[in-house]
Every structure is written in C-alpha cells, then in structure tokens.
C-alpha cells in the first residue's frame, strides 16, 4: 500500500495505451518495415502496470485507442474491472493537427462510442495523440460529449506540442468557456523556460534525484500529473535494425530503470484517476 497522508492529493497517474511500434519515434521505421506491427507486446506490459497500481491500491486513467476494440477488448474490460478509468486516445493514433473538421469529429465521437460499448463505462476524458491538441479540438470535444481533455503540455520550445493558439493554457486544472475541463501535464521552471517532468521520455531520461526534487515541489504545490506508455517498462521489446543513434537513445534509454522509478513515486505519493477527482 502507498502512503496514507496524501489520500486527497491531486496526483494523477495516466497511461497512453499504445504498443511499442506506435511510438512517434518509430513511425519512420514502421513505414520501412511494416512487419514491426506484428510484434505485439501491449498486453503483457499493461498487465504489469495494472498489477503495480493494484499493489498500492491506486486507480489510474488509461487513454485507449478505439482501434484496440476487437483484438484487445478483453484487455480494455480488464482495465475497467480493476477499477481504473478508460478514457479516449482517439481511434487511430493520428495527430489531430493533420485532420479536417469532419475527420476530427469522427475520431472523437467514434472512439468514445466504441470504448463505452466495449467496457460498459462512460468515457469522460480525452488525450490527443502526441499531445497534438488544437483550439478546434477543444470545441469539438465539448460537442462530442466529453467532460475533460488532458492534452495541454505547457512546455517551452516545442511548437504544436501540447499547445493552444488562442484558448488559455495553465499549469493546473482549469475550465474552458464551453465547460470542458483541462488537466495539463506537469512542468517545472528552469530559469525563464518550462520543461517537462511529467513522464514518458522525460521521466526516463532526466537524472532521477533531480526529478524527485521537482516532483516533490509539484506535489507540495497541490498538483502532479504523470504519464507513461506500457512499452516503457519493457526493456526486452524488439530493437529496430538500422535505427539512428539519436532515436535509439530517445526510445530505448533507461527502459530498465522505468519500473523502479514508478515504484519509487508510488511509494512516496498517492495517485488517483482523473475521473476520481471529478466525482469526489
């Protein structure tokens, strides 16, 4: 079990439910070698994450692709049966910035519908693939019946990544005029810039003692939101031939340390799903 002194803390553990070959850095290699998509490792890695959460009694939010329904319906049901929140990650893991209005509407509505039918649970939240959120998507999410978004990542220097152009952005939960809530990912100030500490590659690559100090400050300030991908706890997933040195670092570095890093933050802080916060 985790610590009992932060049961009401606004600390969220979220998972982008994707297989290793769906990572952004892998897409150019997948186009050259489509057979990569036959080497599935999602289920075994996701079950490990579920077991880790269960061992501490925590609930998480799992942002799931609609196209997982069918092959992975039983896995999606398992997430819900273990008391976790199933939210939408879109249908096809396509960046929202590449969609016209009609395609965007279909992605949002169809993923919500198909996931709700699969797990018999209301899908309240959404996260854009690769944090490719847009102002238009915020309005479309409200029209599609979502209650919150979790795609804003207010870091410095990455254009189009977790950013809105005209609508407001903040580092803590806030509400848009259309009623949609936003649960942004956590950043930290480093001089005049905001850098990510919220998970994914950043959680793997930064020195962990430094990260813990920044996380501790975020928790004390009342809001910490971290995310992971199931493949990031799998140091044995396939090594792509011909991968560049930089991409190899980006994708594979510190995979062997990820489970321990998650265990350490689980033992130090309490975590909830976003849905728990909205209904409490």
Predicted segments, located by residue:
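Active-site beta->alpha N-cap acidic-glycine motif
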Residues: 2, 6-82
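C-terminal domain-boundary segment and adjacent tail
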Residues: 55, 205-280
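Conserved, mostly hydrophobic/aromatic
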Residues: 16, 53, 86-89, 111, ...
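Active-site-adjacent pocket scaffolds in enzyme catalytic domains
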Residues: 117, 121-223
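Metal-dependent polysaccharide deacetylase catalytic core of the NodB/CE4 family, i.e.
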Residues: 56-136, 146, 151-152, 178-179, ...
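Short, solvent-exposed loop/turn segments at secondary-structure junctions
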Residues: 18-20, 67-69, 92-93, 131-133, ...
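Generic structural signal for well-ordered alpha-helices
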Residues: 46-50, 73-77, 105-112, 138, ...
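The substrate-binding groove and active-site-proximal loops of carbohydrate-active enzymes
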Residues: 32-40, 63-65, 92-104, 124, ...
């Amino acid at each position: 079990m985790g610590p009992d002194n932060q049961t009401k803390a606004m600390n969220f553990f979220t998972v982008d439910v994707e297989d290793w070959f769906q990572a952004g850095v892998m897409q150019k290699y997948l186009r050259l070698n489509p057979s990569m998509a036959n080497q599935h490792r999602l289920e075994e890695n996701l079950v490990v994450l579920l077991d880790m959460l269960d061992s501490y009694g925590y609930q998480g939010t799992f942002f799931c692709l609609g196209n997982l329904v069918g092959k992975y319906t039983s896995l999606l049901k398992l997430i819900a049966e273990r008391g976790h929140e199933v939210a939408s990650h879109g249908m096809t893991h396509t960046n929202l910035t590449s969609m016209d209005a009609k395609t965007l509407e279909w992605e949002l509505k169809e993923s919500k519908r198909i996931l709700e039918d699969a797990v018999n649970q209301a899908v309240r939240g959404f996260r854009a693939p690769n944090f490719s959120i847009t102002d238009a998507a915020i309005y479309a999410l409200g029209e599609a019946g979502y209650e919150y978004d979790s795609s804003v990542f207010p870091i410095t220097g990455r254009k189009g990544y977790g950013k809105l152009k005209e609508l407001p952005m903040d580092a803590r939960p806030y509400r848009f005029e259309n009623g949609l809530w936003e649960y942004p990912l956590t950043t930290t100030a480093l001089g005049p810039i905001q850098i990510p500490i919220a998970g994914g590659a950043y959680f793997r690559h930064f020195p962990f003692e430094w990260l813990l100090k920044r996380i501790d400050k975020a928790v004390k300030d009342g809001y910490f939101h971290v995310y992971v991908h199931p493949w990031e706890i799998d140091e044995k997933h396939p090594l792509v031939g011909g991968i560049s040195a930089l991409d190899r670092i980006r994708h594979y570095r510190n995979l062997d340390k990820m489970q321990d890093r998650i265990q350490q933050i689980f033992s130090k802080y309490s975590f909830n799903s976003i849905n728990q916060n909205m209904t409490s």
